Curated annotation (Swiss-Prot):
ATP binds at K268. GO terms for biological process: cysteinyl-tRNA aminoacylation. SMART domains: DALR_2 (SM00840). It comes from Nitratidesulfovibrio vulgaris (strain DP4) (Desulfovibrio vulgaris). One of its GO terms (molecular function) is zinc ion binding. Zn(2+) binds at C27, C208, H233, E237. The lineage of its organism: Bacteria, Pseudomonadati, Thermodesulfobacteriota, Desulfovibrionia, Desulfovibrionales. Binds 1 zinc ion per subunit. This is Cysteine--tRNA ligase. It holds the Pfam family CysS_C. PANTHER family: CYSTEINE--TRNA LIGASE, CYTOPLASMIC, CYSTEINYL-TRNA SYNTHETASE. Its EC number is 6.1.1.16. A motif ('KMSKS' region) lies at residues 265-269. A motif ('HIGH' region) lies at residues 29-39. InterPro entries: Cys-tRNA-ligase, Cys-tRNA-synt_Ia_DALR, Cys-tRNA/MSH_ligase, CysS_C, Rossmann-like_a/b/a_fold, tRNA-synt_1_cat_dom, tRNAsynth_Ia_anticodon-bd.
Amino acid sequence: MQIYNSLSRRKELFTPAVPGKVNMYVCGITAYDLCHIGHARSAVVFDVLVRYLRHTGLDVTFARNFTDVDDKIIKRANEEGLTSQQVAEKYIDTFYEDMDRLNVLRADIEPKATGHILEMIALCEKLIAKGKAYATPSGDVYFRVRSFPEYGKLSGRDIDDMRSGARVAPGEEKEDPLDFALWKSAKPGEPSWTSPWGEGRPGWHIECSAMSEKHMPLPLDIHGGGQDLIFPHHENEIAQTEAALDKPFVRYWMHNGFVQVDAEKMSKSLGNFKTIRDILEGYLPEVLRFFLLTKHYRSPIDFTFDSMDEAEKSLKRIYEALSLARTERGRSKWSATPLPADVTAEFDTLDRAFDEALEDDLNTAAALGHVFGTIRLVNRLLEDKNLRKSAETLALLERLDGLVAKWMKVLGVFGREPEAFLSDLKECRIRRKGIDTTKVDALLEERKSVRAAKDFARADAIRDELAALGIEVRDTPSGAVWDVL
């Protein structure tokens, strides 16, 4: 598999340090608020990576942490009249609920920062002993950025350029404006722990270094997160870990792209902040997951309701095809009509292309393209009145079951019973569009009556009236059925 390594800024052949085993760490949430669509993207991207690596036979140990002590958590605790621990527990619970709805697998290891205070203190002590960090009279501990010559190697930033715009804030006791906090002295009303430098709490960056070192052998095979974490968080992780341990921290760095909303940066100040729960009020969770896979993970993705509608339509087409394929397989008689020679070859090619897309830096967008190619091929066979009855078509439909199982295993979508998904989708669209089903049923009943009376003009007028409400009517041998456009 080729992976784009943010450190080398190029694709590299992925080879685990220990053949057959992968140690992977992804930065998790700071537990102070509901998860937004940016969190969803990172979670889904690395969930698919774990799924695919396991699909290829690798033994993956996946860790994703929780930051449960932080300035933002303390602020939220004061706002809500809770302790910091209560706030963190509350939002860790909502994180799990959201991830379960998005079919994101649980990590194998889910460390919390507050459970690793001793490891963080020990790491600080190592850095101080090596002259890479220093304690201040007030009990803060800072990392000496200039003591690490490779600082900036991940983000590509020049240390002198960073120095030109840096300032020491009033009250800080930094030797250099570039230095960052490893340990913060206690402030009134904040959670704190006993340390050699007095009561205090860890800085954000030291948390991931301590947790990853405790639970996994270093260097990590893969460390992931959003592009917003490259600097300063991941840059600082590298500096403090490699300075303390004198060995590489991570072999492959992976970062997913930003999520925009209507082509603008998502922010509360712009009023375009979208939590996962906001979105799932109007869409099925599988639609959101599918949408997040329609772009390459390193590319930015623009969330709009139009793009969600398109993702919903695409997913619906796939499930409709799977439903039709299942119905056709119930046929009792099959013919000996041969399929065109290229059909089976095309089916095989599309299957291989799906895997090849994911081998190429986890290109889910291209992989979904091959899923659609497979669905179009199946539809083409089922729309042909002769080929749909062929025993060779039955063989391909049986193979389709295996492909769908693989798509579900790797991408985490297409795993529901088609009829159940389509029924839930219809109900979801009815709620989202505020459709009055009583009115729809009454119009359909009237249409049935006027058709029986051969008043086709009125029947057509009712169809148009329903279409204006966003309702599509199809006449079948067993009667009219309707769906939401």
